[in-house]
Design a protein with these regions (language model features):
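C-terminal interaction segment
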Residues: 2-73, 80-126
Length: 126
């Protein structure tokens, strides 16, 4: 409400590190609160919040690799939504490491990067 954050669904290129790194990811959903990170090609620097939706056949190793990559880049919040198990894994950055919590699709989940935003998964059709 009244903030500068914007939501960008895939396809949307994110260059996680502002240096010469060639690491580019394409999260399912990126939330960016700093408009200075936006370019005509996508985003340069870590989004504030990334949501990935697990596709059947996706490797859990991919989730772990991205988890470490996103923590190193400074992504403040990372959610993995698994429609098959009906679980949401929420990782909230504390200093340089993620604090992890898990929820079901029957729960209301606080978005940690905002003071007053909750997502009620019971209300969503997934």
């Amino acid at each position: 409400k009244g903030g500068t954050c914007e939501v960008y669904p895939a396809p949307f290129a994110v260059k996680l590190f502002e240096d010469n790194s060639k690491i580019i990811v394409e999260p399912d959903i990126s939330v960016i609160c700093d408009p200075n990170k936006l370019t005509d090609r996508g985003c340069t620097g870590a989004p504030d919040w990334i949501i990935e939706i697990v596709s059947p056949g996706n490797s859990s190793n991919d989730d772990i690799r991205k988890l470490n990559l996103y923590a190193d880049a400074g992504v403040r919040e990372y959610w993995i939504v698994d429609p098959l198990s009906k679980k949401i894994f929420v990782y909230h950055l504390e200093k340089t490491n993620f604090k992890a919590d898990s929820y079901t699709f029957q729960e209301k989940i606080k978005v940690n990067i905002y003071d007053d935003l909750w997502i009620d998964f019971k209300e969503l059709e997934i």
